[in-house]
């Protein structure tokens, strides 16, 4: 009984081993017999095959792709070995495709067209591409540039999303992670991995309420220093640089009152004796909405440079290039 049991167990084991071997052989056949190593294929052979299947004449096909008749004959020989099929055979009317050749004639042009599209930049970008693209822009810059930018892009990229009031550090992370496509802002340094393009250079201006006592006095640096100033906190998404740190000649009596928003600071300045120093484009927009005067400061702060910023991962993308060009064209138009 034990002997018979051992024989049955051995037979089952042998059958399982045989099935495993058959499965391994079948998998090996699929990997080595039916899945060709693409690295070993010369793409030029497929280009030659496309021409041969179209013209069905070695000489004419060679002329079409700029190769000699002997070179095309050699290519046809290699193709026959690659596909293990004659592909094209002689007849009384010339070359005619085999069934495999007919099959390839139907599929090869679309496959090569896909490859060509992948490696060739498109010269014409559909304006529908703007769908889902995101432009990050701080709130104070939105005041200055969106009235001109949005009409410009309405026809060119109608689906562009604008994300306003975003802190610069978040915008930088968003560019790297792909959540944001472009950012507009002020940056003094070149960050590694990022590209920037200058849009325009602005100068600073003061915002004071109508009837401010300082307007009746001599507008000097000393008098300017005695005024109570408003400033935008460096932690604010509206922050446009530590402007008061860049004014070494200004010995203000007191530190400025910090605000998180240009508009909030401007509203307060319109009802008090605070003076607010902002980029002139921002000052012009704000003074059109609030009872504020725009006055040049009695000293010359460093210019305020506004940049278009993007990550290196998008630098060579043709669609992204198009969008950068359109945004830059809109913001550079009418620049100061």
From Swiss-Prot:
The keyword Mitochondrion does not apply. Keywords: Activator, DNA-binding, Nodulation, Transcription, Transcription regulation. The keyword Transcription regulation applies. CDD domains: PBP2_SyrM. GO terms for molecular function: DNA binding; DNA-binding transcription factor activity. Residues 58-77 bind DNA. Residues 41-98 form the HTH lysR-type domain. Belongs to the LysR transcriptional regulatory family. This is HTH-type transcriptional regulator SyrM. It comes from Rhizobium etli. The gene is syrM.
């Amino acid at each position: 009984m034990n002997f018979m049991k051992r024989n049955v167990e051995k037979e089952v084991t042998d059958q399982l081993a045989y099935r495993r071997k058959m499965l391994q052989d079948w998998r090996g056949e699929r990997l080595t017999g039916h899945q060709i190593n693409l690295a070993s294929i010369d793409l030029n052979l497929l280009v030659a095959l496309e021409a041969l299947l179209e013209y069905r004449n070695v000489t004419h096909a060679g002329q079409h792709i700029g190769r000699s008749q002997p070179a095309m004959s050699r290519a046809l020989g290699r193709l026959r070995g690659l596909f293990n099929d004659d592909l094209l055979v002689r007849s009384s009317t010339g070359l005619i495709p085999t069934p495999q050749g007919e099959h390839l004639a139907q599929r090869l042009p679309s496959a090569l067209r896909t490859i060509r599209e992948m490696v060739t930049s498109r010269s014409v970008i559909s304006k529908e591409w703007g769908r889902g693209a995101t432009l990050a822009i701080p709130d104070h810059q939105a005041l200055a540039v969106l009235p001109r930018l949005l009409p410009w892009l309405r026809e060119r990229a109608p689906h562009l999303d604008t994300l306003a009031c975003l802190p610069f550090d978040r915008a930088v992370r968003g560019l790297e992670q792909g959540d944001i496509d472009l950012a507009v802002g002020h940056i003094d340094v070149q960050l590694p991995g990022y590209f920037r393009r200058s849009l325009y250079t602005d100068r600073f201006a003061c915002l004071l309420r109508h009837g401010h006592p300082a307007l009746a006095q001599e507008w000097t640096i000393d008098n300017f220093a005695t005024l109570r100033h408003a400033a935008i906190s460096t932690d604010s998404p509206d922050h446009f640089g530590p402007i008061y740190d860049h004014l070494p000649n200004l010995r203000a009596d007191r530190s400025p009152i910090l605000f998180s928003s240009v508009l909030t600071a401007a509203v307060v300045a319109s009802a008090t004796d605070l003076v607010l120093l902002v980029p002139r484009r921002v000052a012009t927009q704000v003074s059109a909405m609030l009872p504020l005067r725009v006055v040049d400061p009695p000293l010359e702060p460093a210019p305020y440079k506004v940049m278009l910023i993007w990550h290196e991962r998008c630098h060579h993308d043709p669609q992204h290039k198009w969008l950068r060009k359109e945004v830059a064209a809109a913001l550079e138009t009418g620049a100061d």
